[in-house]
Swiss-Prot record:
The lineage of its organism: Bacteria, Pseudomonadati, Campylobacterota, Epsilonproteobacteria, Campylobacterales. It comes from the Bacteria. This is tRNA-2-methylthio-N(6)-dimethylallyladenosine synthase. It comes from Helicobacter pylori (strain G27). It is found in: Cytoplasm. Catalyzes the methylthiolation of N6-(dimethylallyl)adenosine (i(6)A), leading to the formation of 2-methylthio-N6-(dimethylallyl)adenosine (ms(2)i(6)A) at position 37 in tRNAs that read codons beginning with uridine. One of its GO terms (molecular function) is metal ion binding.
């Protein structure tokens, strides 16, 4: 039997799709890249914005037209969590609905017709399904916490993923060792508030924090690099930043989700920090790690965002000069505080602001790329590049998170760490050769 999985959204969803495949492999399902040949089609959904939800029902309609006569369609993930049985009403071709915290129950629901499984289980026994058999890969996703206790006014995640619980460190270390023995060189640690790790366990455990976990993971033989997403700026205190800077295996790239550069908007968003506080954290980080790569999220058009508020966001963009920007127009979500507000920034205003923000960021990337020429980086080889079956190089990421295309006729295997020199750039992209060539 064959299964096709369409994955939308964040890294947590990618990890959930891996889990779905692992569970289904026990039932002799094999993954296929062609939905027309699948016996089971799964759509792993995202509900952070409205656009992916609209896309969901369009995809369901397309899959219903092309699927095999007896093939089933299942909807999983965050949209499944908050819409539940309403999905079955809107899309009769769907056979079952499986929430974001119910992935391990896929083997139960595929044999039921019109099943809905979205209830959240907070018992520690649920940890057993956080780890599962994974195929060998250089870069592995590793969950360290589930859920979110923050109450940001715009965000539906606490409703779809449940309250925040940290996975016991001994279980995480055991899984990381297994991944290392299977060839993993880089870990990507996952959590909705990943750097708040240790704030709450579902039962009594020794007091540890995120920095403690990073140090322990760094001791595992075979693990060369550690990244993590998504942290919250509130938990980036001096102690964390200092240990982040000192740990040689922790990559010197970090996600710092700003959301808005306006203190007034940040207060409405319930983010818990101000523009000045955020800039102070960036200043402290850059003092410790001058070459650090910083990515961020920015929402434009949040209710009541004024022209002055948006200019504050542009000011932060200029001061920080983010290496990566994920930017969106505000999307009202159900089960959120802001979703009930009547105030709305006109779409044409929001669209204009987004365009200006993104255009300026593209310019910043080009300016930063020029400064990279002549610099050296150590790249973890992710993929070989071939033309007409001839090796022409490889691609991968630097310690600071820069994606680099490397020209090299020598065979370099995925997982190798290679020193390269930047020789050119184009539209923010970096090209390099191996050091000494």
């Amino acid at each position: 039997m064959k299964v096709y999985i369409e994955t939308m959204g964040c890294a947590m969803n990618s990890r959930d799709s891996e889990h779905l495949l692992s569970e289904l492999s026990k039932l002799d399902y094999k993954e296929t890249s062609d939905p027309k040949t699948a016996d089971l089609i799964l759509i792993n959904t995202c509900s952070v914005r409205e656009k992916p939800e609209r896309k969901l029902f369009s995809e369901i309609g397309q899959f219903a037209k092309i699927k095999k006569p007896n093939a089933k369609i299942g909807v999983c993930g965050c949209t499944a969590s908050h819409m539940g049985a309403d999905i079955l009403k809107k899309a009769p071709s769907v056979s079952f609905v499986l929430g974001a915290r119910n992935v391990s129950k896929i083997s139960q629901v595929i044999h039921k017709e019109k099943a809905v499984e979205v209830a959240i289980d907070y018992d520690e026994s649920a940890y057993a399904f956080e780890f599962f058999e994974k195929k060998a890969q250089i870069r592995s996703l590793l969950n360290i916490s589930i859920g979110c206790d923050k109450k940001c006014a715009y965000c539906i995640v606490p409703h779809t993923r449940g309250k925040e619980i940290s996975i016991p460190m001994d279980l995480i270390l055991k899984e990381a060792e297994k991944l290392a023995n299977n060839g993993t060189k880089e870990l990507m640690l996952l959590g909705q508030n990943v750097n708040n790790y240790g704030a709450r366990f579902s039962s009594e455990h020794a007091k540890v924090d995120f920095s403690d976990l990073l140090d322990k993971l760094s001791e595992i033989s075979g693990i060369e690099r550690i990244r993590f997403t998504s942290p919250h700026p509130l938990h980036m205190n001096d102690g964390f930043l200092e240990r982040f800077a000192k740990n040689p295996k922790v990559c010197k790239s970090i996600h710092m989700p700003l959301q808005s550069g306006s203190s007034a908007v940040l207060k409405m968003m319930r983010r818990g920090y101000s523009k000045e506080w955020f800039l102070n954290r960036v200043e402290r980080l850059k003092a410790l790690v001058p070459e650090v790569g910083i990515s961020t999220d920015i929402i434009v058009g949040f209710p009541n965002e004024s022209d002055k508020d948006f200019e504050d966001t542009m000011e932060v963009l200029e001061k920080v000069r983010f290496d990566t920007l994920y930017s969106f127009i505000y999307s009202p979500r159900p089960f959120t505080e802001a979703g009930a507000w009547k105030e709305r920034v006109p779409l044409e205003v929001s669209s204009s602001r987004l365009e200006r923000l993104q255009n300026r960021h593209k310019e910043i990337l080009e300016e930063k790329a020029k400064l990279e020429v002549g610099k050296t980086h150590v790249v973890l080889v992710e993929n070989r590049r071939e033309i007409n079956n001839q090796i022409v190089g490889f691609e991968g990421r630097s310690d600071t998170g820069k994606f680099i295309e490397v020209a090299c006729k020598e065979k370099r295997n995925p997982g190798e760490l290679v020193e390269v020199e930047i020789i050119s750039h184009s539209k923010g992209r970096l090209m390099a050769t191996t050091k000494g060539n």
